[in-house]
UniProtKB/Swiss-Prot annotation:
It is found in: Plastid, Chloroplast. GO terms for biological process: translation. It comes from Saccharum hybrid (Sugarcane). HAMAP family: Ribosomal_uS8_B. Gene3D superfamilies: 3.30.1370.30, 3.30.1490.10. It comes from the Eukaryota. One of its GO terms (cellular component) is ribosome. This is Small ribosomal subunit protein uS8c. Keywords: Chloroplast, Plastid, Ribonucleoprotein, Ribosomal protein, RNA-binding, rRNA-binding. PANTHER family: 40S RIBOSOMAL PROTEIN S15A. GO terms for molecular function: rRNA binding; structural constituent of ribosome. Belongs to the universal ribosomal protein uS8 family. The gene is rps8. The keyword S-adenosyl-L-methionine does not apply.
Amino acid sequence: MGKDTIADLLTSIRNADMNKKGTVRVVSTNITENIVKILLREGFIESVRKHQESNRYFLVLTLRHQRRKTRKGIYRTRTFLKRISRPGLRIYANYQGIPKVLGGMGIAILSTSRGIMTDREARLNRIGGEVLCYIW
């Protein structure tokens, strides 16, 4: 039985966000590095650094916490992450069938023949692929 490193990455970020942690440490693989680069570029995390411990590499992510003020006080905005395609049920979409997350407000991350990219990049390049996760 294999490990789902993408689900581990998303769960670690989600748990750290719910517990108001500033940093998260996740195992570094090629897929997780590409997903973290997309999250950094889209502004969901602040910074990334690679850390080595006894022959294993880890990514240390600094989360972005936004605060907004309402009548009842200050509250934190949350980052929602949802795994779509999983090892037991793969979900594929052609470029015309790539879903828009929250009407274009969120992003979908796809694994295509040209690498891991967002839904907007895949539509511009007119290529489809496996829908890995939604982020909004």
